[in-house]
Amino acid sequence: VVLLLLPVGVSADALPGFRYEDATKFQIINKGWDNTTEPYTRLPQQYMDSCREDQQWLYNHSSGIAVRFATNSKRIAAQYNLKNNFHMQHMAMTGIKGTDLYYLNEERNVWEHVNTARPQEKNFKADSVQSKLYVENLDGEMHEYMIYLPLYDGINWLQIGVDSTAELTMPRVENPRKMGKIVIYGTSIQQGGCASRVGMVPSAMIQREYNLE
């Protein structure tokens, strides 16, 4: 089976015929706890008082978190709402606050990068909504996908866009496997500094390589 992936750079806002669904309906992976106050944060509120102030700032960052889903759509897009929408001089915006779409090549059991959402500055105003058409001209068969979230920003919500008549479901393949989790703690390198895009944070690369969260 050959899946032809044609990444594109057009804003999803400009295209008709999409149906958007809230990403919390699907599988959120690479979190240590499920009882966080928001779906895309990494630490439960009960542990915040014991964290340093700089660690609390990182609490809202979605580094390493991804959403798994399956669809037969010929086009895939996303819209997401950034918490801060700030920038850093020493790191690409695609790493700070972009998103990455990956496709599971089931014949090789390998995740392949499809495309990256390149954030629009929008005057660096907080509460910024970003839109991206990742890919079009797919084969219309059911495939497995994953969207990685920003490394040095957080999101309030994420919507996945597909063709209006397409199926959009929970993943049908168990990848990553449900057999324990890997704990990663360290310097800013583990957070993702200064990866060029969000799928290249060490925790995400380990997840794809070993098929574990």
Can you name each region flagged by the protein language model?
Residues 179-203:
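Catalytic nucleophile-elbow at a beta strand-turn-alpha helix junction centered on a G-D-S/GDSL motif
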Residues 203-213:
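Short helix-loop-beta junction
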Residues 10-181:
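N-terminal secretory targeting modules
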Residues 7-9, 194:
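Charge-rich, low-complexity terminal tails
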Residues 1-7:
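Bacterial N-terminal signal peptides
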